[in-house]
Swiss-Prot record:
InterPro entries, per database record: aa-tRNA-synt_IIb, aa-tRNA-synth_II, aa-tRNA-synth_II/BPL/LPL, Anticodon-bd, Anticodon-bd_dom_sf, Pro-tRNA-ligase_IIa, Pro-tRNA-synth_IIa_bac-type, Pro-tRNA-Synthase_IIa_type1
GO biological process, one term: prolyl-tRNA aminoacylation
Catalytic activity: tRNA(Pro) + L-proline + ATP = L-prolyl-tRNA(Pro) + AMP + diphosphate
EC class of the enzyme, as a word: ligase
Subunit structure: Homodimer.
Keywords, ordered alphabetically: Aminoacyl-tRNA synthetase, ATP-binding, Cytoplasm, Ligase, Nucleotide-binding, Protein biosynthesis
Organism: Syntrophotalea carbinolica (strain DSM 2380 / NBRC 103641 / GraBd1) (Pelobacter carbinolicus)
Pfam annotation, one family: tRNA-synt_2b
GO CC terms: cytosol
Protein family according to the UniProt entry: Belongs to the class-II aminoacyl-tRNA synthetase family. ProS type 1 subfamily.
Localization annotation: Cytoplasm
Protein name per Swiss-Prot or TrEMBL: Proline--tRNA ligase
Function: Catalyzes the attachment of proline to tRNA(Pro) in a two-step reaction: proline is first activated by ATP to form Pro-AMP and then transferred to the acceptor end of tRNA(Pro). As ProRS can inadvertently accommodate and process non-cognate amino acids such as alanine and cysteine, to avoid such errors it has two additional distinct editing activities against alanine. One activity is designated as 'pretransfer' editing and involves the tRNA(Pro)-independent hydrolysis of activated Ala-AMP.
Coarse class of the protein's main subcellular location: cytoplasm
Length: 571
């Protein structure tokens, strides 16, 4: 491809609404252009990288025995009503009616559609196992779309679905997909971790997220340096540490704490460590229940853990008026003593004695508070967010916190959807059996964005070879010099004949401008053809990663570069 024939509109300045580096660079490098909030045009240069990821995905899905199909993006509401998700999914589901007032949605995932397809086409266990996938545009009406392709409303996704006669078969399918995902992200040239994760709106028994490690990542990852344990912060377990039974030594007493609402303010006023305080959160479930949750003062609530314990979809902090009604005081002074609410507590509270809590009265706290003597807890559970320095729940090592970008997610669904939609097959005894399912997603555009987050420098993108839009950029220093242009044209043709994907920069621009664009767009290898080098029958090779430069004999350059491309792509 010739630059003069190619739509590659680079930008010198970063658009003001771009926040993270991948968004900035994808706009500046002419990969995407914004159409509306969270909705983007994929320009030729960006689409080439996306197609590279899609091809790797297809190869590994096919290798794992999955078959590609394509399902409609528009889904009738009846299927979502059957599964129960029409009411529970939330406002991210874009719903609409057609001219006949029939209800539809734009499918953010396709569990219902694929289950409906299979229940109407698969009759016998002899047709199993089955694994079907698609690569398709999807839509989620995110309340705050941001970060370009990281959190858009419209996005490209690979979603796969496995069907088995029993749980053992489903476990085999899950492991195949897990390993396929590892190969996909390794082939994309990414540094990543597979972590235990919450199943969220998809549901099911267990899941793993594939997280690209990047400082800009929205997600926190907990991992152990001594074993393989790794989990999303929402799922990360907190190990119970052995401790002596707390012994109450102080009397319960009320103390004035004027204007002290926060943990930090109370600790400073009373001259105690935050670890000696217990905070009382008044929360509400989506079912309307109001309850109290106790945490040690230096710990934070993990909403997902609490939702799992309560069996609800969402919890929120109670509004100020509700807090005032149930405690008699403003937020910041709530406490469990004489509180007429259901009380749950994190395990860490179980090991405390003589602690400080709110007194359910303005500007007042209790000191010398103790369990059982002063109040009771209905249930203790792991309710707090894991922190760096916590003990690993698997091996006793020390946990670390990383930042990551989720690019893939695999789920064991069990019979959640097959039971809801009546997807059964006849087993070898002629009995109806509900299908065991798994689902497996990859954000294709997000994978490209995550690769840029992980591979860039102050000058621009540094594409990994396997997903680079082009392998090689041939830069003509001065296309007005016939000898230089002819040599570049010949080199360009040689590379194409060898199967190398090459962009020829034949623009009549200043060399410095071309070199800046070359750094910005991040093509892995650059061959510079100029009069000075041609005097020695040589061209300059520069690797984008690291910037190493060396001269190559003109006659051998194409073959040498081809070998570098083949090695870097692992083929």
């Amino acid at each position: 491809m010739r630059y003069t024939d190619y739509l590659l509109p680079t930008l010198k300045e970063t658009p003001s609404d771009a926040e993270v580096i991948s968004h900035k660079l994808m706009l500046r490098a002419g990969m995407i252009r914004k159409l509306a909030a969270g909705i983007y045009n994929y320009l030729p240069f960006g689409l080439r990288s996306i197609r590279k990821v899609e091809q790797i995905v297809r190869e590994e899905m096919d290798r794992a025995g999955a078959m590609e199909l394509l399902m409609p993006m528009v889904v009738p509401s009846e299927l979502w009503e059957e599964s129960g998700r029409w009411e529970h999914y939330g406002k991210e589901l874009l719903r609409f009616t057609d001219r006949k007032d029939a209800s539809f949605c734009l499918g953010p995932t396709h569990e219902e559609v694929i289950t409906d397809l299979v229940r109407n086409t698969v009759r016998s266990y002899r047709q199993l196992p089955l694994n079907l996938y698609q690569i398709q545009g999807k839509f989620r009406d995110e309340i705050r779309p941001r970060f370009g392709l990281m959190r858009g409303r419209e996005f490209i996704m690979k979603d796969a679905y496995s069907f088995d006669i029993d749980e053992a078969g489903a476990d085999v399918a899950y492991e195949k997909m897990y390993q396929a995902y590892r190969r996909i992200f390794e082939r994309c040239g990414l540094k990543f971790r597979a972590v235990e994760a919450d199943t969220g709106n998809i549901g099911g028994s267990s899941s793993h997220e594939f997280m690209v490690l990047a400082a800009s990542g929205e997600d926190a990852i907990v991992s152990c340096g001594q074993c393989e344990y790794a989990a999303n912060i929402e799922k990360a377990e907190v190990a119970l540490t052995a401790s002596d039974t707390p012994v109450a030594a102080a009397e319960l007493a009320r103390v004035d704490t004027p204007g002290c609402k926060s943990i930090e303010e109370v600790a400073a006023f009373l001259k105690v460590d935050k670890e000696r305080l217990v905070k009382t959160l008044i929360v509400q479930t989506d079912a309307g229940e109001t309850l109290a949750v106790l945490l040690r003062g230096n710990h934070e609530l993990n909403d997902i853990k609490l939702c799992r314990l309560l069996g609800c979809n969402e919890i929120t902090l109670a509004p100020d008026d509700v807090v005032g009604k149930v405690t008699g005081a403003a937020p910041g002074f709530a406490g469990p003593v004489d509180l007429s609410l259901r009380v749950l507590a994190d395990f860490a509270v179980q090991g405390m004695a003589d602690f400080v809590t709110g007194a359910n009265a303005a500007d007042t706290h209790y000191v010398g508070v103790n369990l059982e003597r002063d109040f009771t807890v209905e249930q203790f559970a792991d309710l707090r967010a894991a922190e760096a320095g916590d003990i690993c729940p698997r091996c006793g090592g020390v946990l670390e916190i990383w930042r990551g970008i989720e690019v893939g997610h695999v789920f064991k669904l069990g019979t959640k959807y097959s039971a809801a939609l009546g997807a059964t097959v006849l087993d070898d005894q002629g009995q109806d059996r509900e299908l065991f399912m798994g689902c497996y997603g990859i954000g294709v555009g997000r994978t490209v964005a995550a690769a840029i987050e992980q591979n860039h420098d102050e000058n621009g993108i540094v594409f990994p070879m396997p997903i680079a839009p082009f392998h090689v950029l041939v830069t003509v220093v001065n296309p007005r010099q016939e000898e230089v242009l002819a040599a570049a044209e010949n080199l360009y043709a040689e590379l194409q004949a060898l199967g190398v994907e090459v962009l020829l920069d034949d623009r009549d621009e200043r060399p410095g401008s071309k070199f800046k664009d070359a750094d910005l767009i991040g093509i892995p290898l650059r061959l510079t053809v100029g009069a000075r080098g041609l005097k020695e029958n040589a061209v300059e090779l520069q690797e984008r990663a690291g910037g190493e430069r060396r001269m190559l004999p003109l006659a051998e350059a194409a073959a040498l570069v081809r070998d570098m491309v083949v090695e870097a792509c692992g083929r």
